[in-house]
Amino acid sequence: MISIPKDEFQQIFVKDLMISSEKVAHVQIGNGLEHALLVLVKSGYSAIPVLDPMYKLHGLISTAMILDGMLGLERIEFERLDEMKVEQVMKEDIPVLKLEDSFAKALEMTIDHPFICAVNEDGYFEGILTRRAILKLLNKKVRQHNR
């Protein structure tokens, strides 16, 4: 049985583990789907945040959402890439963490999501917390206590 003292995690917050916004690919409201698809493909991410010009978080967009938006009744309508905007296909109802949220809350949320967007108290995008960052910290703590 693995046992790690609870206090090991009480002073760890989302802001301590997240990747800052400057290092995260994103698109803005008003961008076309073609631009969003290019950013997704070039970055290698499966989904990216959608921000307004002031960096407020509005949702996520993924390659699957873009492809779904291009589906017609009988074919993929590639011309929709030029016609449609990010906000027409993005997902607005997404899980979000605050900078001061606890490690425990972050751990619970990353069970179902590969990453969670982190925002400040006003809803402005600050970065992402990845499942990888959570697992790295857990692995480190387990190794420390199993010596």
Task: Mark where each language-model region is.
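Tandem CBS (Cystathionine beta-synthase) repeat/Bateman regulatory domains
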Residues: 1-147
